[in-house]
Amino acid sequence: MAGKKKKNTKEKKQKKKWRYALYALEIILLLILIPSAFCIYKISQIETYHMDQNKIEENEFSDSNIGNYTNIALFGVDSRANELTKNTRTDCIIIASINNKTKEVRLASLYRDTYVYIADHGYTKLNHAYAYGGPELAISTINKNFDLNVHDFVTINFSALSNVIDALGGVDIKIKKDELKWVNAYAQDVARINGTKVKKIKKLGLHTLSGVQATGYCRVRYTSGGDFTRAKRQRTVIQQIVKKAKSADPITLYQLMDEFLPQIYTSLDTSDILSLASGIFFYDIQANFGFPFDSATPTINGASVVTAETLSSNVSKLHKKLFETVNYSPSSTVEYRSNEIASLH
């Protein structure tokens, strides 16, 4: 009898241990599933654009390395009415090229005033393409003029950028003498649009800029270098955002998602976004640069534009810098456009 009681007590203790283990497992699963469910819910709030891939045009060209990279077009629009789809010009055009194996990232700013051929519109500034035909025409224009294979995009306006930076606690930026008054002026404009207030920056040097201040910094163009240095500022801010995100705690990252994801417009679906987001801690921005590399700023048909000298040689350099390609030759389309642009100025 005593032996039976001892056995029952042992069984009860064993069941109790299993119950605790199950409770612990349930808690662990909840801790995993709740954040995952939150992420999926937030991603579902993104304004997804189901792009007609048949409308995306590419040239026939040979580049043995380009297939090892995921290339995404990043468009920044200065839309006061939160218009992200089209009918607005792109102030920022960046190709983010991600090495699928190493997760190294290269950022190429395509200067917005670059003189290119846009289908059905002729030669004009690159930033007009998005306004004329939305993402499809903008991406096709990029692909056709620069021998690229971009098929996806992310569009964001300046209000969303400001919110992202604030969610990360600001970004560290060094303010130079010729930038100071313009950063303050543009920051005031951003604050007015956002319905917020902003502190005036009074000293030169390193500052942790708020979202509004950093967005103002991204918009400055009236300094030495004009749009070239503005594009560089935009890449600097992106680098700082990635740096901050990589070191952020989970709560900050959830806050970032809460602020950012509902305010973007993209062709990427949920699985694409989750796949890209899973690599955030491994992404390493190895290089950033502006395109074209060798350029002139002539006036053509009354408009000041940026022309490559020559387009074909600059596109060759672009492929080398983005994809480390050594055996690429420009397509016949790029060669033709290169000769036509050269004859116009």
Positions of predicted regions on the chain:
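Second-shell loop/turn segments in exported
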Residues: A81-L84, T124-Y132, D147-D152, L204, ...
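Solvent-exposed, acidic/flexible segments
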Residues: N65-N71, V77, L84-R89, A119, ...
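Flexible, polar/acidic helix-loop-strand segments at domain edges
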Residues: D166-T252
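Extracytoplasmic
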Residues: G67-T70, T88-I93, T102-L110, H121, ...
